[in-house]
């Protein structure tokens, strides 16, 4: 799939353009809501990309902002395309479309994990053990559904046009026995296999590195192919995670990732550490 052409990134792009045009028209969110007979909160949610916008609403807003002709119709068409369901809609009860949609459109993904193997790199048995541990009240059908959703996400790495994926993990990830030795043996070997892909890089931050920026928690920096689509950061948490889009926040996490890469072992040395773990679990 061509990166940056999915419905989520189109919605984000349209939201940014609607906000820019409103500001250029010297209108406040409250004034737009009053003129279009809708709530100011609806306008705000549209501009932040938290909700989609119908082609009719987009046309009404664009007319109010003074945009006409082909330029207006191009943005109305963008609104239509942004409403098309992505593959992840089949798993809407598992994860938010915004996260998976942006992940699917990204041209680069920079992930840090201190406790677990990143989701895109997990084997099915490792994912099952993680989900079962983190959701002790889930029944087997719910667990299976979540495993299937995670497996579907992983198709991204074998796409004909995959994103550049760079994962930095703490050495503790290799020592935390999730699911037992057999599960860990398969998981560590899976990491070695994926690291052979030209678009995948895996590094390990050794215990000897001491304190590091990633101690704050796991995060993902998503980059996109078009200059009009700025980078965004996803900070993971048990309550569902959240996005950071303000430039200072994105710069901070980008710098954190750069420091983590520097603190980590070189990719080849990291694979040696992973191979040692794989051998240990295979005994």
Regions found by a protein language model. Give the residues of each.
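C-terminal regulatory/effector modules of DNA-binding transcriptional regulators
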Residues: 180-283
């Amino acid at each position: 799939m061509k990166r940056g052409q999915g419905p989520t990134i189109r919605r984000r792009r349209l939201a940014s353009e609607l906000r820019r045009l409103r500001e250029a028209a010297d209108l406040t969110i409250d004034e737009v809501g009053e003129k279009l007979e809708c709530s100011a909160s609806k306008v705000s949610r549209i501009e932040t990309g938290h909700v989609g916008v119908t082609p009719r609403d987009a046309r009404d807003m664009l007319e109010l902002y003074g945009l006409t002709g082909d330029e207006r119709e191009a943005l109305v068409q963008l609104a239509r395309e942004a409403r098309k369901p992505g593959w992840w809609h089949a798993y809407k009860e598992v994860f938010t479309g915004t996260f998976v949609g942006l992940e699917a459109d990204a041209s680069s993904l920079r992930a840090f994990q201190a406790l677990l193997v990143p989701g895109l790199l997990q084997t099915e048995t490792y994912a099952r053990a993680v989900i079962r541990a983190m959701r002790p009240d889930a029944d087997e059908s719910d667990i299976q559904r979540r495993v299937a959703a995670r497996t579907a996400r992983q198709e991204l790495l074998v796409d004909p046009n995959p994103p550049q994926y760079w994962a930095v993990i703490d050495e503790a990830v290799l020592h935390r026995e999730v699911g037992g030795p057999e599960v860990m043996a398969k998981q560590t070997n899976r990491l070695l296999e994926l690291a052979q892909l030209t678009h995948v890089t895996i590094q390990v931050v050794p215990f000897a590195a001491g304190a590091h920026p990633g101690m704050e928690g796991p995060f993902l920096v998503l980059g996109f192919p078009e200059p009009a689509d700025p980078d965004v950061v996803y900070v993971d948490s048990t309550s569902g995670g959240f996005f950071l889009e303000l430039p200072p926040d994105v710069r901070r996490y980008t710098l954190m990732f750069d420091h983590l890469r520097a603190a980590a072992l070189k990719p080849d040395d990291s694979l040696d550490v992973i191979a040692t773990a794989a051998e240990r679990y295979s005994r």
